[in-house]
Amino acid sequence: MTQLPARYDHVGSFLRPKYLLEAREQKAKGEITPEQLRKVEDRAITEIVKFQEDVGLKSITDGEFRRTYFHIDFLDQLGGVKTDIPVTIQKPDGTQELAPPVMRVVDKVRHVKNIQLADFQYLKSQVTKGNTPKVSIPSPTMLHFRGGRAGISREAYPELDPTFYDDVANAYGDELRSLAAAGATYVQMDDTNLAYLCDERMREAARARGDDPNELPHRYAAFINKVVAQKPAGMLLAMHLCRGNFKSTHAAAGNYEPVAEALLREMNLDAYFMEY
């Protein structure tokens, strides 16, 4: 097991400064280019790196300032994954909002580009020597849990086990190796699904999709271990179990008992960040 940089650590997500929120809105309206937005993101990341170092943190993130969604930004760049265009829904109070886009696996999953490399290189350039830049990516289980079997092409994957899980793990392995080649030694996978499987409402939703919520944690442990088996030597691979967060409101509750065996006995990860 690889050791954490210090006895204290953090998940890595920070509130975006107002000027970055405004720039993202301008980009969405077509008022600025992606290149102009990236320069604003660079400024915000430089500032949040300094903040983390000033308070004494040893693992340093980019605040996740380049993300729109914690999972889609990454997974949508894998070959074989398609994200539907978000639709506007009307809420009970009459207001409208964009529903989160839906991801589907439409072909064989594969690594077609280095997804986080440029982001990591900028982060690394800002981190003081002696501190450790940390990269956060979504858990591979995000490609299965939300849509279940119906969200994965039967033409590409008549059976999920083992081909689907192997293909996703291989794609993740390629990404981890590209990061390691650039000097990354610390990667965190963000996973909502194991925490969701502690909540009876979410467990019932899994049943409705045709999955067994008692079996899923063990299947996901084996799935995640396929990724862990491909991590480069010297890389720390952690998992953040997130209960969901929207305007400081969690999406799932419940103790960890339904997933504890799979989480703590079966998975081969180096560290966990667990929300209570």
Residue spans of the language-model regions?
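Domain-level signal for soluble alpha/beta catalytic cores
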Residues: 1-276
